[in-house]
Amino acid sequence: MKLTFLGANHEVTGSCTLLEAAGQRYLIDCGMEQGKNVYENQPLPVAPGEIDGVLVTHAHIDHTGQLPLLVRNGFRGRIYATKPTTQLCSIMLRDSAHIQEFEAEWKNRKAKRAGAEPVEPMYTVQDAEAAMQLFRGM
């Protein structure tokens, strides 16, 4: 068994650990870093399509906030969480997506005036809804 700490290495947010055992790869959480520009969140060093599943410890965004991005980038495995965590994630991930879209829109209005390149939201409500389809409540 091998554990690789991918997030929350230098601070407490962005929890994400890769568990490799018996030829399978699972993430333990897939959280968003908070407290800085969310556009600085780094991609995973593992292709999302190579991950077999995600185990979610709880619904906080610093433990679940990059799940929609993971799905957007090709993850098709299952996301395992308790039923209450799944219910909370349904609300929180959609809300986070709304915030991502709003912030991108706001930054793009400023960028247009400054002649800068537009930015994309980290993920959209549609991405959050796609992620929710992969949840399996336990």
Question: Predicted regions span which residues?
Answer:
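Conserved beta-strand hairpin/beta-sheet module of binuclear metal-dependent hydrolase folds
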Residues: 1-49, 53
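Hydrophobic/aromatic beta-strand patches that form the interior of the parallel beta-sheet core
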Residues: 4, 26, 55, 80, ...
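Short N-terminal micro-motifs specific to bacterial/archaeal maturation
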Residues: 10, 79-80, 119
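Phosphate/oxyanion-binding loops and surfaces in catalytic or ligand/nucleic-acid-binding neighborhoods
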Residues: 19, 92-99
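Short, low-complexity, polar/charged sequence segments that are solvent-exposed and flexible
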Residues: 22-25, 45-48, 74-75, 98-102, ...
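Active-site metal-binding motif and surrounding structural segment of the metallo-beta-lactamase
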Residues: 37-88, 94
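Metallo-beta-lactamase
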Residues: 96-138
